[in-house]
Amino acid sequence: MNKHVNKVALIGAGFVGSSYAFALINQGITDELVVIDVNKEKAMGDVMDLNHGKAFAPQPVKTSYGTYEDCKDADIVCICAGANQKPGETRLELVEKNLKIFKGIVSEVMASGFDGIFLVATNPVDILTYATWKFSGLPKERVIGSGTTLDSARFRFMLSEYFGAAPQNVHAHIIGEHGDTELPVWSHANVGGVPVSELVEKNDAYKQEELDQIVDDVKNAAYHIIEKKGATYYGVAMSLARITKAILHNENSILTVSTYLDGQYGADDVYIGVPAVVNRGGIAGITELNLNEKEKEQFLHSAGVLKNILKPHFAEQKVN
């Protein structure tokens, strides 16, 4: 019996794309990886460099340079290409530049006969995931953005440092836009099963104002990293690898990816970060948390910001 060979096509061999490729090989997530970039020499150099470390990888991963034609039999096409976020520039200011780039990329991929899952990483990710869905014509379940997976991971890490617990035992979500209007879901945050609100109430060492500062630190993390080193790439690459693993291994894992809402959380016709079940088919379902009134208001504001950004670019886009 022939075993299915998992194949990922990576478009964009910049900082994020290269780090993603490195993570895929180090974790043995896929059987085959094709790297595609307008800068052929850079992509070929990455492939050579990655191949030279194959002796240390947990499993064989066929890694090669390719073209859009190689997307035809890929299970996942991960798009990391696009204009970079500059110091002081918000993710949403990147819209104009990256929409033009994406229209060309997606049309080339679809022309190959691709019928898999798009995974979008380029910012502003919620806008570009919506655009990828529109440009591709694929079912919404098979177009996924990295969403707030990294923001949630940042949140869990910072809370783990604050409460002195492993990040794996901190269960907390950041939802909404991957950007300035994202919000924490305090009403469902817990450490080892104990609600954060209860920890604060019972221990004077923990203060809500310090937790609020953690939220600000999460929101501004990318800006701080960009100021220091010019770009963020390791964290987002690891989150992309996590999503890829959930898809290829058919995990039914719940991750805060950017997914299409059609009435859930009171939002409609928008891609936005919410907890969703991710498996081989893409988005298998959306986990609708029971938000408190403040969280509902913040989430709808976040969705509204994204919809207003989309409106000039997609005439048929519905605005509540």
Curated annotation (Swiss-Prot):
Gene Ontology CC: cytoplasm
Role noted for this protein: Catalyzes the conversion of lactate to pyruvate.
Positions contributing to substrate binding: Q85, R91, N123, P124, V125, D126, D151, S152, A153, R154, T232
Enzyme Commission identifier(s): 1.1.1.27
Record gene name: ldh
Phosphotyrosine modification, residue list: Y223
Regulation: Allosterically activated by fructose 1,6-bisphosphate (FBP).
Record-listed NAD(+) binding positions: F15, V16, D37, K42, Y68, G82, A83, A121, T122, N123, S146
Alphabetized SUPFAM superfamilies for the sequence: LDH C-terminal domain-like, NAD(P)-binding Rossmann-fold domains
Recorded family membership: Belongs to the LDH/MDH superfamily. LDH family.
Active-site residues, as the UniProt record annotates them: H178
Keyword annotations from UniProtKB, A to Z: Allosteric enzyme, Cytoplasm, NAD, Oxidoreductase, Phosphoprotein
Gene Ontology MF term list: L-lactate dehydrogenase activity
The organism of origin for this protein: Bacillus subtilis (strain 168)
Pfam families reported for this sequence: Ldh_1_C, Ldh_1_N
Pathway annotation from the record: Fermentation; pyruvate fermentation to lactate; (S)-lactate from pyruvate: step 1/1
Localisation per UniProt entry: Cytoplasm
Name of the protein in question: L-lactate dehydrogenase
Gene induction: Strongly induced under anaerobic conditions. Activated by ResDE, Fnr and ArfM.
Signal peptide: none
InterPro entries assigned: L-lactate/malate_DH (IPR001557), L-lactate_DH (IPR011304), L-lactate_DH_AS (IPR018177), Lactate/malate_DH_C (IPR022383), Lactate/malate_DH_N (IPR001236), Lactate_DH/Glyco_Ohase_4_C (IPR015955), NAD(P)-bd_dom_sf (IPR036291)
CDD domains assigned to the protein according to its UniProt record, in alphabetical order: HicDH_like (cd05291)
Catalytic activity entry: (S)-lactate + NAD(+) = pyruvate + NADH + H(+)
